[in-house]
Amino acid sequence: GDGMMEFNSSFYFSIFIFLLTYAGIMSERIPRSLCALLGAGLVVYSGLVTQEMALRHFIDFNTIGLLAGMMILIGVVKKSGFFEAMALWSVRISKGRPKELLIILGLITGFCASFMDAVTAVLLITPMTISLCRRIHVTPIPTLIAEILLSNIGGSGTMVGDPPNVMIGSATHLVFNDFAMNTGPIALLNVAACIIYLEIIYGKELPKTEMTEEELGKISISSVITDYSILKKSVTILALTILGFIVHNIIGIESATIALTGGVLAILACSVDPHEIFRDVDWDSLFFFIGLFIVVGGLETTGVISALAQAGISAVGGDPEALTFTILWLSGIASAFIDNIPFTATMIPLIHNMQELLGLAHADYMWWALSIGACYGGNGTIIGASPNVIVAALAAKEGYNITFGHFMLKCFPMMLVTLLTSTIYLYVRYFLFGTP
């Protein structure tokens, strides 16, 4: 009857808006935040969702708040010269040897990406990497590629690292410690695999030079620290914030509140100008998330997501194991070619739906498969994840071109290796020894 027709038109219209938004994001002609906000506007104007529904049900403000809070907090830490000091320290430790420097800077990036947004990590570390590599007369491209790979792997290990994890943690009952215990071990394993891999692909082509004792002596770490009191206070508050994440489910306070409190306390304690800090927040990303949540909300309301969930189950069968590995590899391959943030935003309600249909409310391994796939898939191509795009843009500005082909040649095999190790990990941990 009439109702059916109506269902069909809005059903297809929500898909149309979604694909339009996606095409805009992938064309890179229009900033992705604007694509998402225009898509969100269409969803509301076309009557698929009301503004109230969009604001109340679809935008995950915990994700937005957590990212904003961490951006503010890291903005304060940045003012102390902490990150420049870390960069100089890594030159000293590596004695200026290109291969050791690549590994140390890569590990620092991976470590930073695990407790702050990976984008922020590479924004801080990329410019320093380029200047350090110039100092030791070697092309920064291998080191930058190492940093991209390790930022995506490091970010997958905790709930506050990569955006897919932030979103999954926010949309489910999973908390900080769940991520540390489940995606953490495989991240560590893959960091090791990545370093061996980098050794294989770049070991030969990096020169064997090193700095003289005299040159190393000239590197003064204390000279780059602009303010010791800001350094002490802001790093202490950062540590307390991370502690807050670890106990957030015990104290019953959501992670966004903890991050925003940390940010505000850091601004107050270090008496820095809030205008300056707020100006440096990556608003583009935050608005991208807001718009995206509404566009995906359109797909949810019109029943597209549940239709996809049913199609997925009938294609793969209701076997939890087969579904889990399908989620892992689908997420991995898809996230290599499309941004892993919109992909995850679409997959979250899809997995919720599948779990309901199959009565698998506690099948957390499906979330781990999504998280691992989306994070590691980001390593497949230069457009696979936000950090990649940012590193490439910053490098191009300095005259170093990381081409799509070069990156894919070096990194796609690494992505496949990490997905293989993850397949074995998920199988052994949740199906062989676990009780699915």
Residue ranges of predicted features:
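Re-entrant/interfacial helical elements at transmembrane boundaries that shape
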Residues: 120-131, 144-145, 158-172, 306-311, ...
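Juxtamembrane and boundary regions of transmembrane helices in multi-pass small-molecule transporters
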Residues: 7, 135-141, 157-160, 177-225, ...
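Structural signature of hydrophobic alpha-helical transmembrane segments
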Residues: 6-16, 60-72, 114-122, 186-188, ...
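Hydrophobic alpha-helical transmembrane segments
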Residues: 12-16, 33-38, 65, 99-107, ...
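Transmembrane alpha-helix interface/packing and boundary motifs in multi-pass membrane proteins
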Residues: 20-30, 108-117, 148-160, 247-250, ...
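Flexible hinge motifs at transmembrane-helix junctions and intramembrane kinks/re-entrant loops
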Residues: 19-38, 228, 232, 240-260, ...
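Membrane-embedded alpha-helical segments and adjacent helix-loop junctions characteristic
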Residues: 52-141, 283-358
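Interfacial loop-to-helix junctions that mark the boundaries of transmembrane helices
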Residues: 3-10, 52-63, 176-186, 226-230, ...
